[in-house]
C-alpha cells in the first residue's frame, strides 16, 4: 500500500456507487463505516439539502458496491499530492478463478497517487494494489502508471491517458480511476490556480471566474450567473 506520511488531508471527496451502499458496509466492511457516516451527518448538520433518488419501485438486494475515494494534500515542498482509491465489494461469496472471495472482502482495492505542480502537470506517479482478482498478475502493473508523468490534468489528459494506459497497457480499473483526477484536483485547488471569486472578494477583478461556462448551471446566459456573478452575464 502507498505510504501516507504527509500533512493532514486538505480536501476529501467520496463517491458511493449506490445510496444503499451503507448496508453492505455495515454488514461486511465496517472499516469504512465511519467515513460514510461522516458524509451523511455532514449534510444534515450543515443544512445542505440532501436530494436522494426516488424510492425504488420494487424490493431489491444489493449485489455490488464500488467506492471511489480521492484525497488532495498540500506538501511542504509546495507540490500537491492527489491520492485516489477504488474498491469493489460484493455482497455475496464470489467464486473467482483464483479461489473464493467471501462477501464483504474487496475484489479490488487499488491505489493511485499523482504529484502535480501548480500548473497541474504530473511530476510523479505511483500505483499499488492491495486486493486483486488475479494475485501475482494484476498487481504487477503499478510501474506502468509512471507513464502519467508529464501529462497535464487540463490539457487532453483523458485522451493521453487512454493512449498510454488503455487495454493491455494498464489496469482497467486504475485507468478508470485516473479519469476522475482532473475534476477532483480542480475541486481541491481551483482557487490557488485560477480566479474563482467575483465582486469585492475577487482575486483579479478584470478576469472572469474560472468556473463560468464550464457546466450547465454556470452558463453565462443562465440564472445562476445572473444571481451570483451578474457582472459576467452574457450580453444578448
Give the ranges of each region predicted by the language model.
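Leucine-biased recognition of intrinsically disordered, low-complexity hydrophobic segments
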Residues: 2, 23-24, 33, 39-40, ...
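Intrinsically disordered, low-complexity polyampholyte segments enriched for Lys and acidic residues
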Residues: 5, 17, 27-30, 41
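Cysteine-centered motifs
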Residues: 10, 37-38
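Short, Gly/Pro- and small/polar-rich lid/capping loops
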Residues: 49-80, 85-90
Amino acid at each position: 500500500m502507498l505510504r501516507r506520511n504527509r500533512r493532514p488531508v486538505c480536501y476529501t471527496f467520496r463517491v458511493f456507487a449506490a445510496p444503499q451502499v451503507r448496508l453492505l458496509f455495515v454488514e461486511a466492511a465496517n472499516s469504512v463505516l465511519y467515513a460514510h457516516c461522516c458524509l451523511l451527518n455532514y449534510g444534515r448538520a450543515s443544512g445542505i439539502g440532501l436530494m436522494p433518488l426516488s424510492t425504488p419501485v420494487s424490493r431489491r438486494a444489493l449485489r455490488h458496491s464500488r467506492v471511489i475515494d480521492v484525497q488532495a494534500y498540500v506538501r511542504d515542498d509546495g507540490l500537491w499530492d492527489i491520492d485516489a482509491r477504488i474498491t469493489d465489494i460484493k455482497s455475496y461469496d464470489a467464486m473467482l478463478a483464483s479461489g473464493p472471495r467471501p462477501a464483504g472482502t474487496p475484489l479490488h482495492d487499488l491505489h493511485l497517487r499523482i504529484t502535480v505542480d501548480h500548473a497541474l502537470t504530473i511530476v510523479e506517479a505511483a500505483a499499488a494494489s492491495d486486493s486483486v482478482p488475479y494475485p501475482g498478475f494484476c498487481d504487477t502493473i503499478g510501474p506502468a502508471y509512471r507513464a502519467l508523468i508529464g501529462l497535464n490534468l487540463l490539457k487532453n489528459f483523458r485522451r493521453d491517458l487512454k493512449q498510454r494506459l488503455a487495454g493491455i497497457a494498464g489496469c482497467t480499473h486504475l485507468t478508470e480511476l485516473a479519469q476522475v483526477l482532473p475534476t477532483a484536483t480542480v475541486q481541491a485547488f481551483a482557487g490557488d490556480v485560477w480566479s474563482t471569486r467575483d465582486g469585492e472578494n475577487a482575486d483579479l477583478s478584470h478576469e472572469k471566474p474560472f468556473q463560468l461556462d464550464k457546466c450547465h448551471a454556470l452558463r453565462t446566459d443562465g440564472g445562476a450567473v445572473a444571481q451570483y456573478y451578474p457582472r459576467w452575464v452574457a450580453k444578448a
